[in-house]
From Swiss-Prot:
GO terms for molecular function: ATP binding; ATP hydrolysis activity; ATP-dependent DNA damage sensor activity; damaged DNA binding; single-stranded DNA binding. Coiled coil: none annotated. Can catalyze the hydrolysis of ATP in the presence of single-stranded DNA, the ATP-dependent uptake of single-stranded DNA by duplex DNA, and the ATP-dependent hybridization of homologous single-stranded DNAs. It interacts with LexA causing its activation and leading to its autocatalytic cleavage. GO terms for biological process: DNA recombination; DNA repair; SOS response. Its main location: cytoplasm. The lineage of its organism: Bacteria, Bacillati, Bacillota, Bacilli, Lactobacillales. The keyword Magnesium does not apply. ATP binds at G79, P80, E81, S82, S83, G84, K85, T86. It is found in: Cytoplasm. SMART domains: AAA. GO terms for cellular component: cytosol. Gene3D superfamilies: P-loop containing nucleotide triphosphate hydrolases (3.40.50.300). Disulfide bonds: none annotated. This is Protein RecA.
Length: 378
């Protein structure tokens, strides 16, 4: 009996060795035909963290969980009109450029304001801009830029404005049922693999529509079919809430609005977190404002009455003075920003030094914008 068992073990071992050899040969052939990394063992990548790029907003980085937008993924930003969708996307463009990357903006709405983009920190001289004549043309341009592997971020503004060529060539009143949805579905199938391979971040801005005849539940939906919802790794719902009134001579006028950004879908971290930011007209997201609020909640910045202090030193009476002080002292802004990121696990102690240069450059630009006093109409 023991002799028979030993013989079975030898047969099994031999069969196992042959299987491993056959698998190795198959992997070599696949790698030869399709390139290195076409097939790999999951354990080889298990310890790799998801690569991210900061959104340009500390509060949004925290809500995203991973510390920013994941590279090689599709992001959808949607919301009502004038809620701040394009502003959020332009901050991502500015951040990509500050990190030394190349960004492209597909302006299907033909409504990009270069002066406002520059006020948000976008280098408009280096920004690649396309204003396509049709939806197919815009998506084809985005695809070629992504396939090049040389672009770090592509923004499409907006999906609702990607009009199929057949609809443009037809007459007003003609029925074109499902054309845009089919176009987007085909584009997602074609672009998703290339986006992941080149580690490009693709941001699609979308509008809201209402379903007709919905009695129960949320009647809101986004145009372009269901494909984008499925392929997107992150979906952000941007909603403006209350107006921000000015002080002094501007006490009766609105200088910005409080905005909530809800992460309604997230494949790289827990979803449903909310970032509350202040979008100031002509300035974009107030980075000093969100830092003062978050650091105060964590007691990194101490608040006693109306006074804000850091490490025992007063930095301003009232939030506006505290924000101004941080804008004028970029090294202090960087230090507090790093402490907040470490507290939320977005930055490890060993990564602090590498983050210092980028954060310092961002704050220098912020201080320069405040000194110039640029004001842009919304």
């Amino acid at each position: 009996m023991a002799k028979k068992l030993k013989k079975n073990e030898e047969i099994t071992k031999k069969f196992g060795d042959e299987r491993r050899k056959a698998l190795d040969d198959a992997l070599k052939n696949i790698e030869k035909d399709f390139g290195k990394g076409a097939v790999m063992r999951l354990g080889e990548r298990a310890e790799q963290k998801v690569q991210v790029m900061s959104s340009g907003s500390l509060a949004l980085d925290i809500a995203l969980g991973a510390g920013g937008y994941p590279k090689g993924r599709i992001i959808e930003i949607y919301g009502p009109e004038s809620s701040g969708k394009t502003t959020v996307a332009l901050h991502a463009v500015a951040q990509a450029q500050k990190e030394g990357g190349i960004a492209a903006f597909i302006d299907a709405e033909h409504a990009l304001d270069p002066a406002y983009a520059a006020a948000l920190g976008v280098n408009i001289d280096e920004l690649l801009l396309s204003q396509p004549d049709s939806g197919e043309q815009g998506l084809e341009i985005a695809g070629k830029l992504i396939d090049s592997g040389a672009v770090d971020l592509v923004v499409v503004d907006s999906v609702a404005a990607l009009v199929p060529r057949a609809e443009i060539d037809g007459d007003i009143g003609d029925s074109h049922v499902g054309l845009q949805a089919r176009m987007m579905s085909q584009a997602m199938r074609k672009l998703s693999a290339s986006i992941n391979k080149t580690k490009t971040i693709a941001i699609f801005i979308n509008q809201l529509r209402e379903k007709v005849g919905v009695m129960f539940g949320n009647p809101e939906t986004t145009p372009g079919g269901r494909a984008l919802k499925f392929y997107a790794s992150v979906r952000l719902d941007v909603r403006g809430t209350t107006q921000i009134k000015g002080t002094g001579d501007q006490k009766d006028s609105s200088i910005g609005k409080e905005t909530k950004i809800k992460v309604v879908k997230n494949k790289v971290a827990p979803p449903f977190k909310v970032a509350e930011v202040e979008i100031m007209y002509g300035e974009g997201i107030s980075r000093t404002g969100e830092l003062v609020k978050i650091a105060s909640d964590l007691d990194i910045i101490q608040k006693a009455g109306a006074w804000f202090s850091y490490n025992g030193e007063k930095i301003g009476q009232g939030s506006e003075n505290a924000k101004r002080y941080l804008a004028e002292h970029p090294e202090l802004f960087d230090e507090i920003d790093r402490k907040v990121r470490v507290k939320f696990g977005l930055l490890e102690e060993s990564e602090e030094e590498s983050a210092m240069a980028v954060a310092s450059e961002e704050t220098d630009d912020l201080a320069l914008d405040l000194d110039n006093g640029i004001e842009i109409e919304d």
